């Protein structure tokens, strides 16, 4: 089994914005090795006759259908906003074009 180096764990921790001490680095290296060993075992399983799926459990949409409703006192709500433009809330731009 290939040993996962401390440098590899540190790199992954850096990408995940985690601060790890030496003890945690060693602990995570061991855990990652066990995970990779488990994946190797899974790769040996014959899945030739198993149909492809996107999920292990079927997902059903349980959301209600949207219904348009008029609100008579919309001005009251708009007046509570820190900033507005006509009949809309005005919010800071967060996506660059």
From Swiss-Prot:
Reaction equation(s) it catalyzes: L-glutamyl-tRNA(Gln) + L-glutamine + ATP + H2O = L-glutaminyl-tRNA(Gln) + L-glutamate + ADP + phosphate + H(+); L-aspartyl-tRNA(Asn) + L-glutamine + ATP + H2O = L-asparaginyl-tRNA(Asn) + L-glutamate + ADP + phosphate + 2 H(+)
Record EC number: 6.3.5.-
InterPro entries from the UniProt entry: Asp/Glu-ADT_sf_sub_c, GatC
Keyword field contains Signal: no
Keywords: ATP-binding, Ligase, Nucleotide-binding, Protein biosynthesis
Xref: Pfam families: GatC
Biological process annotations from GO: glutaminyl-tRNAGln biosynthesis via transamidation; regulation of translational fidelity; translation
Subunit structure: Heterotrimer of A, B and C subunits.
Stated family: Belongs to the GatC family.
Stated name of the protein: Aspartyl/glutamyl-tRNA(Asn/Gln) amidotransferase subunit C
Gene (name only): gatC
């Amino acid at each position: 089994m290939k040993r996962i180096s401390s440098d590899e764990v540190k790199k992954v921790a850096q990408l995940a914005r985690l601060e790890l001490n030496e003890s945690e680095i060693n602990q995570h290296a061991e855990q990652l090795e066990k995970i990779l060993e488990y994946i190797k075992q899974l790769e040996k399983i014959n899945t030739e006759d198993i149909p492809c799926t996107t999920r292990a459990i079927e997902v059903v949409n349980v959301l209600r259908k949207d219904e348009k409703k008029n609100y008579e006192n919309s001005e009251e709500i708009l007046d509570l906003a820190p900033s507005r433009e006509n009949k809309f809330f005005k919010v800071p731009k967060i996506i660059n074009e």
